[in-house]
Amino acid sequence: MDSLMDSKDLKYNRLIRFLLERSLISKGQFEIIYTRKVMGKGFDYDVKNRSKGAYYRLLGQSRSKVESILYSILLLVAIDALDKRALHVMQQLIEQISIIASRDIDDADANDVISIIQELVKQISKDIVAYQQ
């Protein structure tokens, strides 16, 4: 198997591709996280046939990247840059994405969802770095 992205085990739709392309998580890190967390499989299932050392190095990088992302979110909350309104919007977005990402959706519907995500993320980002007088 060439890649997890070609696997029938993953509903690798346009939305997942969009999110992965814009995330701080690499494709390899995503594959590790997905196979371990979602599929419940480890090194023996590695679709890239990586060496054991390379697999566990990538696993460590994945953990470190996820920790950094979580600390970044907590930092933004701590300085009130990510306020309750933004967190509420993100929670709603998370709930919708978790439903949509597990379905087979056509490109037109995916494009609509992606447009909404882009708009909300752009607005939240703008609000986070807005100059307050």
Where are these regions (language model features)?
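Intrinsically disordered, low-complexity basic tails/linkers immediately adjacent to helix-turn-helix/homeobox/MYB/SANT
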Residues: S72-D104
